[in-house]
């Protein structure tokens, strides 16, 4: 017979781990024994048991060993790792940090190496090498070197400045001092000399030099307060608590010097809120968790002195582990721009090859027979053609713009500053400006298709107020009519009878106060007592007043409510908690705290009363609480009805319950609890299992209801974004009914919206899968690509789905593995093949079902996913990214939104009440959801339009410049001779045409910000990629080709058979080059003037200044003086003055410019007249629209002030805090439909643009 231990063990190497999400499988128990009672081969049992013992002996989680006050212990040979060949170093890092990248010797080679890893820079380096070969190059070396040095120099200077700053910062930090036990006494040493195992002393306002275990503190109850602003951006204080035994014995220097504790813990990692370890001391073991660890970068506050043991130092600390490279996000335009550069490169190769073939043919037909062209070498025509191929690669290299990427980064940097400087996105109440935390994604803000938003703190204010409650089936908090109770009044409840009341709670139900004071219903007092004792809040006193420090607004609201109703939490230690119960102080022994996590969705505390009885108090989500209630709870239905009512009013709810525990039961359970607490591996899973054993047969007390108001401007913002064809999905931890009512409150849902729930979706997807399978044969994957809509066109549909249904629909539900012993038998090839095919079919089915779900959801006008975890939020975002190829934006304010924010193309953080984790992980941040409309509809749209105009013009001007060489090659024997002076080629992209296009990319705007917000339909140009795509690219290419033809052939025709004023023919090569170059500079600068929609003095100055700069430099470079100094570099002596004094040369230039620009002007006029865009129509009427905006102020159609609908209590998803969720039925309230409002706005917009 197999033992119980064996029956719980799986040895199948292909089995999935318990916590992994796997699809449904029909062969889940393929290798399991059918009969548990069958006799198992003894040898196999023995092998399995030995393998299990071996696996237990090897501790994967806790392999980091630290011994206090013993540096030699950490220098043992088995702690040394081989770094390079025979060079070894200790696995324990020193505490010196090194964030800089270069030093005085390595800066130049390393920086150049990093820069030449970029394809564009390496390409131009190859060109520079080719230009050094005389047989190939017809261009001077400086034509490529000067632009390349400019690009490399700017980047190198930026990198040098950054690295010098890092050097200074590292030196400053490493040279900070700290007190460390050395030779039995505290001595002051530098941070860089601290080592793992050292015992250190820290004082108030000291920075923590390493990750340390808190040993003792001068504060009562071994508390230590820290500020974690450098870790997570939060300025509110957090508390840490030492072990009672270390705090008791390690207060004086002598005891600290002789402390010889031994720690086994997890290896260094980047999880800031997780730590697992065990302290072995005095023949006892003590569990360690994150609450006992002080992390490097934090600051000691409100604590005079504390002592700690260094566990991780330097590069091993958690803050350094988190300083690695973040995932680099790139925009859609980035990818498209790279593909276009590749296209240009291919065109360059093809054109160069064609011209090289032409040169080989010309050499064979003409060159070999022309004695005056003999160069002394008897090379074959094909060899000369081969050399000329590389010559044309050099001459035409400006088709691939070297300054493109630098210019793009400059424009993005400027656009980011405009976002930072926007006062209309500044929240004065909290002094919080908008912040562009990345500079590479601005134009993508103008292409968003889907917004994924958290609810609590994002759509709502996350300022919690206790409003109602249900106790023993009775609802309290509503106004009570005088007929119901003679003493009830409508005015606010007076809490002056309570000395601990804070005077801030607005409550109207006087009957609840009477119930508390009379004590007629013990459950009422028990209800508020539970709120005062079951929490993780800390208390301190400021000017004699109690001040609570809660990690979440929810927790603070509940504890404050209990305080106002007479049950004030006063103090806590590691083992006790003191509460004032209607003026009488009582202290309870805390026996265990059963912490919160996102899977448990509840928190419990076990206390011993002064009378000696043991009780468990629990609060959490109704879904998990109701599963654990005793079957004889008489008020279950009444409380459920109350939860429904609270949910309909969008109040955040949670359930409260308790149970009596017998001494024997607790003793048995506590032994398991202590064993799980010191488990070396899988500690969290072991604790959760132990928690489940005690949290059952609970007695329901009631439910709380907390108000969380909508933020200002949320409905208006959502309406405008909807008009911009942006779909909004709300992903929240709230229950279905609460989330639905929030949807109505923020106008995401309307009364004529048809809502589909999980059952409906599952049925639709099942039908679609069957149809696809029938059409496609064996697998839906091979179904014909015919898209059929799920709903009839024109229907207003919304989708509301819970996390459990999401797993069900997407085949992501966890499967429970059987506890039957699996034996590992060899499989035949046929069995492996069948198993592989089965898995492949499951993956295909899963993939097709996911795609169908995304198609269905994207047909809906709104999607609300409720009861979802942080992992599910990220999964939903990823599904839309994967199957719709749409640009996504995720916005949230809490730690549970970080994964979603990082997954989306654009992440936006709200700096709210839940700390700064979301902000620090985001690409953009601000304080209010309503600023999102300005970020997208103004800054995003402007950035997209500017970048598109910049890229189109940049490619155009480079093609117009470069292809003149192409036309010239037909007249010079395809000899790779340039059409311009070398210095003009060098400075064209650097000085003559760079500033105007940069300013257009920074300042241009088609319509004002007010009109952009007034007409959100303008936003669709970015969503549809209308302004920059391959079609636009080839139009710009064709425009450049035609411009180059005009620039070459008109001057060529003008120079043929002409005579100057002096009777001589000026048709020399140098005069021709000056004429073409002058016409080119004027044309491309005037062209950008035609492309500019928003004129400023700066734009005008840059255009005319660039032309003036060209002529000034040209006359200087063509002067005799500079030729005398540098005769080989400046060979166009006198060309400019001689050529440009001829009137017909100016006439030629003017004619060339006119022929280039007049067709553009004509096409623009016809386009705006016959096929005007939406922005063209608005520009045409902007004066009238501006007058209307000024004189006809319309009243907003949206309600302002406090909304009657409120938010519900959502998941916290943070370890250590109770999970607060609501449940109930949705009770819709009749409202004026939003469609009418939108229709009015749309009609006005159409009337405006059509008139």
UniProtKB/Swiss-Prot annotation:
Entry GO MF terms: aminophospholipid flippase activity; ATP binding; ATP hydrolysis activity; cardiolipin binding; lipid transporter activity; magnesium ion binding; phosphatidylcholine flippase activity; phosphatidylcholine floppase activity
Gene Ontology process terms (BP): aminophospholipid transport; apical protein localization; bile acid and bile salt transport; bile acid metabolic process; inner ear receptor cell development; negative regulation of DNA-templated transcription; organic anion transport; regulation of chloride transport
SUPFAM superfamilies tied to this protein: Calcium ATPase, transduction domain A (SSF81653), Calcium ATPase, transmembrane domain M (SSF81665), HAD-like (SSF56784), Metal cation-transporting ATPase, ATP-binding domain N (SSF81660)
Modified residues (Phosphoserine): 1223
Result of knocking out the encoding gene: Mice have unimpaired bile secretion, and no liver damage, but show mild abnormalities including depressed weight at weaning and elevated serum bile salt levels. Do not suffer from jaundice or diarrhea and have normal serum bilirubin levels and normal liver enzyme activities, except for mildly elevated serum AST (aspartate aminotransferase) activity. Display unimpaired transhepatic bile salt transport and are resistant to bile salt-induced cholestasis.
Compositional bias segments (type: Acidic residues): 25-35
Transmembrane segments: 122-142, 145-165, 340-360, 386-406, 953-973, 983-1003, 1033-1053, 1072-1092, 1095-1115, 1143-1163
Binding site for Mg(2+): 454, 456, 893, 897
Domain of life, per lineage: Eukaryota
Names of the cofactor(s): Mg(2+)
Topology within the bilayer: Multi-pass membrane protein
Annotated stretches, region: Disordered: 1-52
Catalytic activity: ATP + H2O + phospholipidSide 1 = ADP + phosphate + phospholipidSide 2; a 1,2-diacyl-sn-glycero-3-phosphocholine(out) + ATP + H2O = a 1,2-diacyl-sn-glycero-3-phosphocholine(in) + ADP + phosphate + H(+); a 1,2-diacyl-sn-glycero-3-phospho-L-serine(out) + ATP + H2O = a 1,2-diacyl-sn-glycero-3-phospho-L-serine(in) + ADP + phosphate + H(+)
Location of the active site: 454
Self-association and partners: Component of a P4-ATPase flippase complex which consists of a catalytic alpha subunit ATP8B1 and an accessory beta subunit TMEM30A. The flippase ATP8B1:TMEM30A complex can form an intermediate phosphoenzyme in vitro. Also interacts with beta subunit TMEM30B.
Record function comment: Catalytic component of a P4-ATPase flippase complex which catalyzes the hydrolysis of ATP coupled to the transport of phospholipids, in particular phosphatidylcholines (PC), from the outer to the inner leaflet of the plasma membrane. May participate in the establishment of the canalicular membrane integrity by ensuring asymmetric distribution of phospholipids in the canicular membrane. Thus may have a role in the regulation of bile acids transport into the canaliculus, uptake of bile acids from intestinal contents into intestinal mucosa or both and protect hepatocytes from bile salts.
The protein's name in its UniProt record: Phospholipid-transporting ATPase IC
Gene for this chain: Atp8b1
